[in-house]
Amino acid sequence: GIRDVAVTGVQTCALPICEFDTTARVVINATGVWADDVRALDEDTHPDTIRPAKGVHLTVPWDKVRNDIAVVIPVPKDRRSLFVVPWVPKGDGTYRYTYIGTTDTDYKGPVDDPQCTKDDIDYVLNALNASVTTNVTTDDVIGVWSGLRPLVKPDENAKSGRTADLSRRHKVMTSPNGVVTVTGGKLTTYREMAEDAVDEAQKILGAKKKCRTRSLPLRGATGKRWTSTELDTHLDGRYGSDASVLKSLIASDPALADELVEGLPYLKCEAVYAVTHEMAGTLDDVLTRRTRSRLFDRKATRMAAPAVCELIAPLLGWDQQEQARQLAHFVDECAREDAAGLVTETEFIASHG
């Protein structure tokens, strides 16, 4: 809200369906590609600061590429390169999957729904096939993921028109009403972005202390653990010292050590942990955001979805009707992803009006 020309809080929408007001002495706008939309709620006029850039990855069966290490390949006729990364080792020197990415293209479509289109798939596969001896086709693509980078828009005199050439530096701004906005940056500089944004908020508050992120360990990073079993290696690698919580779940119910999705390394206890410790509130949260199941093997994940839904339903208080709704939403998301891969970027944007 705005009171005495100062923003004093936000109206929040939380799952499943509720809105509530939150008061605060300082509001930080760290909303990525939506940052300009949020600024518009605070300021009557402001320049657009965001230039969205889309990046996509594809997943294919490892046998189609057979790389035993992560490699970087050039993109023909483009000043870019792609990573080709093997994933899920089988223990005999081979892997289950290889994922390839990422792209970097201007994006003019709906920021709420960036999808991997036929153009994206063709771009990645053309680059891959120029560097491998096998022929990888669209039929081999079993998973995709896409997202938008909130790049800082360059000044009008910038020479290059490519998003790949834009700076990945971040920018922190404060509005006349005291809203701190942080834009730009990238995943690997998230701590520095947070530090600069919090330090700016501290100035507004008149506080002398600065952000402490430099001295804070990551979640689960309280000491190295020597692992012995395959299960230990997986859970310790994913959760660090927090793996003890998941091992306790398995001790109380050994069935939670079973695989969550066929062919993927995730266990049923991870779905439970996602709900109880990682704020997962939907089936899609568990299968797409807390684990990467849907991203790596959409078909297998869709097949496993009913059982996963049944597993987490008691933890979230879902009745049969809500379970059906969650499952229908997830299946629809998978279908929309399938459909997007069959159309060009232009056709996809046109379909959104």
Segments predicted by a language model, with ranges:
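Glycine-rich beta-alpha-beta "Rossmann" dinucleotide-binding loop(s) and their flanking helix/strand
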Residues: 37-58
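Single conserved hydrophobic/aromatic residue that forms the stacking wall/gate
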Residues: 1-13
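Structured loop/turn residues at beta-strand edges in well-structured enzyme cores
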Residues: 8-10, 22, 281
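Core beta-strand elements of the Rossmann-like FAD/NAD(P) dinucleotide-binding domain
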Residues: 17-26
